[in-house]
Design a protein with these regions (language model features):
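Conserved helix-loop functional segments at active or binding sites
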Residues: 93, 97-104, 130, 159, ...
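Active-site recognition of the HExxH zinc-binding catalytic motif
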Residues: 17, 144-164, 186, 191, ...
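C-terminal, non-catalytic "cap/extension" segments appended to globular domains
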Residues: 12, 59, 63-69, 153, ...
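Active-site-adjacent bridging/hinge elements
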Residues: 16-23, 65-67, 125-136, 156-167, ...
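Post-HExxH zinc-binding segment in Zn-dependent metallohydrolases
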Residues: 177-206, 214-216, 220, 295
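Short amphipathic alpha-helical coiled-coil/interface segments
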Residues: 39-47, 88, 215, 250-258, ...
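Glycine- and acidic
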Residues: 24-37, 69-80, 100, 134-147, ...
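Contiguous, non-catalytic segments that form substrate-binding/exosite surfaces or channel walls
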Residues: 1-138
Length: 364
């Protein structure tokens, strides 16, 4: 099945005279192939923090050997409950650096019954923010009082505010933003919440739980997705170079990537190499997952510029550009929107902002 998908992609590349198969998938949003290649190549140079994280986990968990599935084990037990009203207060306090206007919009969104909050019988799982132009966004939650659900609320509110700013400033025809920028606002808000809770908590166990949650987020949303993006690229290269496509050759690509990313820190279990066969995006939405990583990298750089910057005037300018990004909807190609906000995804430094973030979290 996957071979037929690869063959179709390369056939379409030839029929439409694309220079490379990447152009087939990236041209819709006018994304240069250099962005994709810069992402996968730079991250392979920045795996040291990832290996450091595994070594720390291995030491704390007192394991002689570390397997991929050990990543699901929490470093500590933390079962504190966060009532919904408390979660709202935490988030509203955390986003104050974005200004009074942003804070007022979020407070309004939380007070007008736009959110279906709690789990109920027959309700679908997950969380989602859906915009309705000329009305307002609606939010689906399944809030269960866990720390994770607090961050999910912050995440979805990021989407909701992005939608509000876009719809308030753009006509209907240009109000929808692309997937390429969609996760910037959501992960930005998660970072604000993390830093606020780390600064205000007096509970050492909560502090560890916060750090562990965010580190897992960096690994899962950035490193893992770039590994998968690299896999897709190499799998397509097999067909482009007229090499044999078999389960073994596909599994060897995955094995080599895990070796590159994790080195000797993780045991190479046999099933690890066939993980490609259960990633639905590979089959249903080729060259989609890299966008999770580009959004995460963009968000990390914007956060450093707009929130952490030491120069007041530059920080204020970066914050203004960030709000303009949220307000831009689909009025331009996403690369142009991000560049106006100060993000150059063709630069290695933009990608390295995430590895620096992971190192900083590990230091804490």
């Amino acid at each position: 099945i996957y071979n037929s998908i690869l063959q179709k992609s390369i056939a379409k590349t030839k029929v439409h005279n694309y220079d490379i198969f990447l152009d087939n998938f990236l041209e819709g949003d006018n994304i240069p192939k250099e962005v994709y290649l810069n992402l996968i190549n730079t991250v392979k140079e920045e795996t040291a923090p990832l290996k450091r994280y595994i070594q720390i986990r291995k030491k704390i968990l007192k394991l002689e050997k570390y397997h991929n599935y050990d990543g699901s084990v929490n470093l500590i037990e933390f079962d504190e409950e966060y009532e919904y009203d408390r979660a709202k207060e935490l988030i509203l306090e955390s986003i104050k650096p974005l200004g009074e206007g942003y804070t007022a919009k979020m407070a309004y969104a939380l007070s007008k019954g736009w959110v279906d909050v709690f789990e109920t019988k027959g309700k679908r799982s997950g969380a989602y923010s859906a915009g309705v132009y000329g009305v307002h966004p609606y939010m689906l939650l399944n809030y269960n009082k866990t720390l994770d659900s607090v961050f999910t609320l912050a995440h979805e509110l990021g989407h909701t505010l992005h939608t509000l700013y876009s719809q308030d400033n753009q006509p209907f025809s240009m109000s929808d933003y692309t997937i390429f920028v969609a996760e910037v606002a959501s992960t930005f808000n998660e970072r604000l919440l993390l830093d606020y809770m780390l600064e205000t908590t007096t509970n050492s166990r909560e502090r560890i739980a916060l750090l562990e949650q965010e580190i897992r987020n960096v690994v899962g949303t950035f490193y893992s997705q770039v590994l998968f993006a690299d896999y897709e690229y190499q799998a397509h290269k097999l067909v482009e170079e007229e090499k044999s496509v078999t389960a073994e050759s596909l599994s060897n690509i995955m094995k080599d990537l895990f070796d590159k990313y994790y080195g000797e820190t993780v045991e190479k279990d046999e099933l690890l190499s066939v993980i490609w066969s259960r990633i639905p995006h590979f089959f249903n939405s080729p060259f989609y997952v890299y966008q999770y990583a580009t959004c995460f990298a963009s968000s990390a750089l914007l956060y450093e510029n707009a929130i952490k910057g030491k120069d007041d005037s530059k920080r204020e300018d970066s914050l203004r550009k960030y709000i303009e990004l949220l307000s831009s909807g689909g009025n331009d190609f996403p690369m142009n929107q991000l560049e106006k906000a100060g993000v150059d995804l063709k630069s290695k430094e933009t990608i390295k902002a995430v590895s620096s973030q992971l190192n900083s979290l590990l230091d804490k």
